Regions:
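Helix-breaking motifs and short loop linkers at transmembrane-helix boundaries and internal kinks
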Residues: 49, 81, 102-108, 119, ...
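C-terminal transmembrane helical hairpin of 12-TM major facilitator-type secondary transporters
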Residues: 309-360
Length: 435
């Protein structure tokens, strides 16, 4: 039995759960960042005189950075290792948030959002993969859901901090706080985050065996562990091209479509709900509270998905969540005139959509072999970020052109069902391995 098989089939120990927690904290930073921009929207737009379309483009600037980060940094992680690229990504994010705090023009803020997004994109890929690789088969879905729950918790705290810091200081303080938290996380990761076991086995860099055994002892697995037999390098110049081989083509394209649709819906809900509810008659505080309820539901929904998917097929549970999310989005917007109902339904919408994201993060790494896993995961997340880039901008343009919020939310619910269809036709990981 090699170390990979030992991890797959053994109970998860303290260090493995610590790795999952570190990944969750990194995802927490993504959640903080997304809700920080959503909840500072009113003051930023007022300071810089931005229209809805212009603010949507500002939000999209950060998301463009995420697309580039997930697609460009992911292949580098397959080549140089998950750990160094994760550390680089966290550093980018910290610097970007600090520059956001110092921004005096919308152009500087847009640049800082791209830089932050670049880091977040790299973080998302690395954390998803490393969580999957250090989890046992039994607890993998739940571990990924714990990691995914970090986003909802970060979003909720981001909303709370945005609310209090803007009241006491200004919107700039929100980004300074984010930069400080990210810098602390960088130090923690530098000390405790290990390299990927699968990377060490697949690429076998210098001192790979010694590093493998050092990690094994931290995991509580005594003895001398050998590297697995190194597979012959495939005649592929770029791991990206392998995603379109006969083995992976269908699953790659359907995964991309699923990510695009679900992330489009998620970022529309996250970015626009507080502002639209305020325009509909809620106070700023009430609209932010509903936004935080969506985030609170998100944290719970990720965990609920993980528990259910530990018992049944991860893909089937994900399809069920997409259908339920579509229905919940429509019911939410039709009931938004009542604050109490809106807050309750906000929790439900947040839970279901974040459960969908947990599902994507669960089935995505299992689709690809270790030598191209980071690339496969990164490009799928990048496709999702393309949806998230379009969501705020398209929504802003449609609102400026006269669409009402009910029509817009119903259209978004329809986009969610596209993911349901794509997932229905995607090959299972067992079918892919047999190919």
């Amino acid at each position: 039995m090699n170390l990979r098989e030992k991890i797959d089939n053994s109970p998860m120990g303290f260090y493995q759960w610590a790795i999952v927690l570190m990944a969750a904290v990194m995802n927490f930073l993504d959640g903080f960042d997304v809700l920080a921009i959503a909840f500072t929207a009113t003051n930023i737009s007022k300071d810089f005189g931005l229209s809805k379309t212009e603010f949507g483009m500002l939000v999209s600037a950060g998301l463009i950075g995420m697309v580039v980060g997930s697609m460009v940094l992911a292949p580098l992680a397959d080549k140089f290792g998950r750990r160094p690229i994760l550390l680089l990504s966290v550093a980018f994010s910290a610097v970007g948030l600090a520059v956001s705090g110092f921004s005096t023009t919308s152009e500087i803020l847009a640049f800082s959002r791209i830089l932050t997004g670049l880091g977040v994109g790299g973080i998302l890929v690395g954390t998803n993969v490393i969580t999957s690789e250090y989890s046992s088969k039994k607890w993998r879905s739940f571990a990924i859901s714990v990691y995914a729950a970090g986003f909802g918790i970060g979003a909720m705290i981001g909303g709370m901090m945005a609310k209090s810091l803007q009241a006491a200081y200004s919107w700039h303080a929100v980004y300074f706080a984010g930069a400080a938290m990210t810098a602390v996380v960088f130090v923690v990761l530098f000390i405790w985050l290990p390299e990927s076991i699968d990377y060490l086995n697949a690429k076998q860099p210098q001192n790979a065996k010694a590093r493998l055994n050092k990690i094994a002892h931290k995991l509580g697995f005594a003895g001398e562990w050998e590297l697995t037999e190194k597979r012959a390098e495939k005649a592929v110049k770029l791991p990206i091209t392998a995603l379109f081989s006969q083995k992976y083509l269908r699953s790659t394209l359907l995964l991309w479509l699923s990510f695009f649709a679900i992330m489009f819906c998620f970022y529309f809900i996250s970015s626009w709900t507080p502002a639209l509810l305020k325009e509909a008659g809620m106070t700023v505080e009430e609209s932010i509270n509903v936004g935080m309820m969506i985030s609170l539901g998100g944290a719970a929904g990720s965990l609920v998905y993980g528990l259910i998917a530990s018992r049944w097929s991860a893909r089937s549970v994900l399809m069920l969540f997409t259908v339920a999310s579509s229905i919940a989005i429509v019911v939410f917007i039709l009931s938004s005139a009542n604050l109490a109902i809106a807050m309750v339904l906000g929790v439900v919408v947040g839970a279901l959509i974040n459960g969908c994201i947990s599902g994507l993060y669960t089935i995505n790494p299992a689709t690809y072999d270790a030598d191209i896993r980071n690339t496969g995961v990164g490009w799928a997340i990048g496709a999702g970020r393309a949806g998230s880039v379009l969501a705020p901008t398209v929504a802003g343009m449609l609102l400026d052109s006269g669409w009402d919020k009910q029509t817009l939310y119903i259209a978004v619910a329809g986009v969610m069902l596209i993911a349901t269809v794509a997932l229905a036709f995607k090959k299972s990981h067992i079918e892919i391995k047999r190919a």
